[in-house]
Amino acid sequence: MFEINGNLKVDINKFKKIYTTVFDKNISPQINEILDLFEFDTTKSSYEDVIEEYSKFENDSLGSFEYLDYSDLRLLSKRKWNNKEALIIGNGKSNYKTTVQIKGDLLDKVLKKPSPVISRNWSPDEQKALMVEVSTLGNKSEINWFFISQQLFLKGISRNARECQRKHESIQYVGLSGNPKAKFKGTFD
């Protein structure tokens, strides 16, 4: 289990069962499949409560972004692993590049991918290879599943949840597959 926010947790084993279908066959999972990945507090178990819980978390994260050096970028998310904080930042449509950056206690590293700008147009392999290698976190495979789970969660519920559409039109959370520098050596700046 991965705790996303207080009452919201993702079941990694359930996620792995639909991973192949989503990425290899390019078939979007159904809403009930997505929600079945998550485990909630018994007092927050409805579809609407899950959206409310996640949206509240995202709003809190956005409000905490005060780094002037990155004022031209959008803060996509704020995450903590083992009490270490990281910021995921993107500038989706600037200069026809999408930048995903993790900055914080863990590392300070940027990967840039030339157009197409919108990440949903990238191939599954490119999506999986985009996320930087978070070498200080220990279990890289768990971090990989965490990011992909976020992507599926947002993709699944955004069709019916305006609260989650507002910030994620042009970016998806992606996971690491192998060494991105080695696999796509000419892709990243």
Curated annotation (Swiss-Prot):
<protein>
    <recommendedName>
        <fullName>Myb-like protein T</fullName>
    </recommendedName>
</protein>
<dbReference type="InterPro" id="IPR001005">
    <property type="entry name" value="SANT/Myb"/>
</dbReference>
<dbReference type="InterPro" id="IPR009057">
    <property type="entry name" value="Homeodomain-like_sf"/>
</dbReference>
<feature type="domain" description="Myb-like">
    <location>
        <begin position="121"/>
        <end position="172"/>
    </location>
</feature>
